[in-house]
């Protein structure tokens, strides 16, 4: 009986510590130090309504927008409840057909030359919000033409939204597609 009582006391104690105190302290510190990130890194539009998160990719298919990495989520694209890769190998005929269709779509939309991998292959999560600067540059001509802008104007906005490697050596340069498209919309609506 004594063993059951001590086990029960330890269970209740650790439940309170690990299930209540620790999460509350970590959440409080996160909200104090990184308030935007702790709340989901939401991005707001010009009317101050939340339009997405800078951490989760979103579908853009209109020619006036930069297109993100393809989504590999099931049921429908960019389904954050079903995050994950396709698990198709590089020799899978269905996968190769899908990649070829994506390359054709980009060439039909005006992209010239070789297409960066980030525009035809989904990321491991299937929800990557970023593309490489090269993947963005290949879309500049299309976006500029549809928006009635010069390529140089679009390039300047792209350069302003290109993030370099963290600490100068971690990761790769990247462009958040949602933030870039919102910047283009905000410029257009001035």
Swiss-Prot record:
An example molecular function term from Gene Ontology annotations: P-type potassium transmembrane transporter activity
Keyword Membrane (UniProt): yes
Coiled-coil stretches: none
Transmembrane segments: 9-29
Record keyword ATP-binding present: yes
Localization annotation: Cell inner membrane
Pfam family, one: KdpC
Bilayer disposition of the protein: Single-pass membrane protein
GO cellular component, one term: plasma membrane
Major localization class: membrane
UniProt KW keywords: ATP-binding, Cell inner membrane, Cell membrane, Ion transport, Membrane, Nucleotide-binding, Potassium, Potassium transport, Transmembrane, Transmembrane helix, Transport
Known function: Part of the high-affinity ATP-driven potassium transport (or Kdp) system, which catalyzes the hydrolysis of ATP coupled with the electrogenic transport of potassium into the cytoplasm. This subunit acts as a catalytic chaperone that increases the ATP-binding affinity of the ATP-hydrolyzing subunit KdpB by the formation of a transient KdpB/KdpC/ATP ternary complex.
Listed NCBIfam families: kdpC (TIGR00681), PRK00315.1 (NF001454)
Annotated family: Belongs to the KdpC family.
Assembly mode: The system is composed of three essential subunits: KdpA, KdpB and KdpC.
PANTHER family per UniProt: POTASSIUM-TRANSPORTING ATPASE C CHAIN, POTASSIUM-TRANSPORTING ATPASE KDPC SUBUNIT
Name this polypeptide is given: Potassium-transporting ATPase KdpC subunit
Organism, as annotated: Citrifermentans bemidjiense (strain ATCC BAA-1014 / DSM 16622 / JCM 12645 / Bem) (Geobacter bemidjiensis)
Organismal lineage: Bacteria, Pseudomonadati, Thermodesulfobacteriota, Desulfuromonadia, Geobacterales
């Amino acid at each position: 009986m004594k063993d059951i009582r001590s086990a029960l006391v330890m269970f209740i104690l650790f439940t309170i510590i690990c299930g209540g105190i620790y999460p509350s302290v970590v959440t409080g510190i996160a909200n104090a130090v990184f308030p935007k990130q702790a709340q989901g890194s939401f991005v707001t539009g010009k009317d101050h309504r939340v339009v997405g998160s800078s951490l989760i990719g979103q579908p853009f298919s209109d020619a006036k927008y930069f297109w993100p990495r393809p989504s590999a989520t099931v049921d429908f694209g960019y389904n954050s409840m079903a995050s994950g890769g396709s698990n198709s190998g590089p020799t899978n005929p269905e996968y190769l057909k899908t990649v070829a269709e994506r390359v054709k779509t980009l060439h039909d939309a005006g992209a010239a030359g070789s297409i960066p991998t980030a525009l035809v292959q989904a990321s491991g999560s299937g929800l990557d919000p970023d593309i490489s600067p090269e993947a963005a540059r290949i879309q500049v001509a299309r976006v500029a033409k549809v928006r009635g802008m010069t390529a140089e104007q679009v390039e300047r906005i792209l350069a302003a939204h290109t993030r370099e490697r963290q600490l100068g050596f971690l990761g790769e340069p990247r462009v958040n597609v949602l933030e870039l498209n919102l910047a283009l919309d905000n410029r257009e609506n001035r």
